[in-house]
Amino acid sequence: MRNAPTVYPGLMVPAMILVISTIIAGCSKNDDPDESEPQTKSVASCEGCHTNYAHLQEVYTPDTAAPAGGCGGEAPHYEPYDRVRMDGDGYEAFKQSSHYEIGCTGCHNGTDNTADKELAHSGDFISHPSVMAAEKCASCHQEIVDNFVTSLHNGTGQKRKVAIRSGFDGPEDFDQLPPHQIEGYNANCATCHAGCGECHVVRPPIGGGGLIDRHNFKKTPDMLNVCVTCHTSRGGHAYLGVAAGTQPDVHLTALDYTCLDCHDAGEMHGDGQPVEQRYAYSKLPECENCHTDLKSKNNYHSIHVEDFNCQVCHSQDYNNCGSCHIHGDGARIPSYLDFKIAGNPIPDVVPDFDLTLVRRTLAAPDNWEVYGVEYTNFDALPTYNYTTPHNILKWTERTDVGNGKACSDNCHIRNEGGALINKELYLFQEDLLEWEQSASSGITVDGKLPESWFEEK
């Protein structure tokens, strides 16, 4: 324990006089602004307005539409004045940053030093500067901006599929789509595809938008308020163990990992090289980065580690939904838990696996009906994607067999009196809806499993 300070009585009176003198001086007029109490900035300035909560409530403009919709559903609501408010610890941290030194109009354009709200936000004002990253961010972050053009967070993967199903070659042709279809994509599908700001400064639109920490720039995005806000129904839903009967991912419960422990900044920002889809990306994390010598770990691995992806054994049931009616009815196949093993949909990208987990996508022939657009080549891609659910456990319904049972008891199909046990784990042609069959029949397991599995014992 630290020793108490020694008190010297002879010094008490002078000290008291000094304190009293200081108090008196503090009550007198002080012409030195550096020594005075902090002053409220004038509302006739960007910073003064956005740090004056009462004034924001007086001058705000009510919303005329929700900030986002799309497949994520209705976004949570934050009042307009709460979305742009700057105060508290976040604002104080922002003031200590190099971004603060740039000044409000340095990033947002517009006009400073005016109480006229319309004038302040007039002309070339931009609410989200990172949509013009080449102009606003590149002077300090040139490499990141250059690489981000091909980042999956910039939407290249989804744009690729829309373009291919529309009869084009890939994401580079996206701008050739009808303008109203592009408008619909931006208003719906793109609400989760992010620029710099949506990870580092503001909530993604699907999370309600607005400053996430009073304009503080977060170098490391917050997992719940940023990552899971977009990756809700498929990523966060699984990783946090939200669904009934599921458990959180072991990487969360045992290691307290956040998304950035596996998916680092290099992966998020991109490397400038275009890829067909996310599993072709060079910086994608692999289980083997941490789990070495997998083949020799146990009998399960020695038999199957080269046959299918790790999630076939170690994933729990995961969320699916499908048939999105964009800007209309939304997902007409509502979310449901499922587990499907199918033929590898991307053998050119992940050539090592014959069987993989797959997840139903939102694709449907009439995705763009509201916008008067029909796909011309819908069958070019399957309606189920290769998937790696983030709900890993060592012991799952597939791996945790009963005492005395064969290790394959919960995963191989077997015929017991005409009943095919475990058949529901696999994607068969009969599982496809009529409009899915032509696009997805190539990845079903029909004719690809051992005949002995179907013979009655």
Question: Can you say where each PLM-predicted feature lies in the sequence?
Answer:
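Sec-dependent bacterial lipoprotein signal peptides
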Residues: 2-25
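C-type cytochrome heme-c attachment and multiheme electron-transfer modules
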Residues: 22, 27-206, 216-457
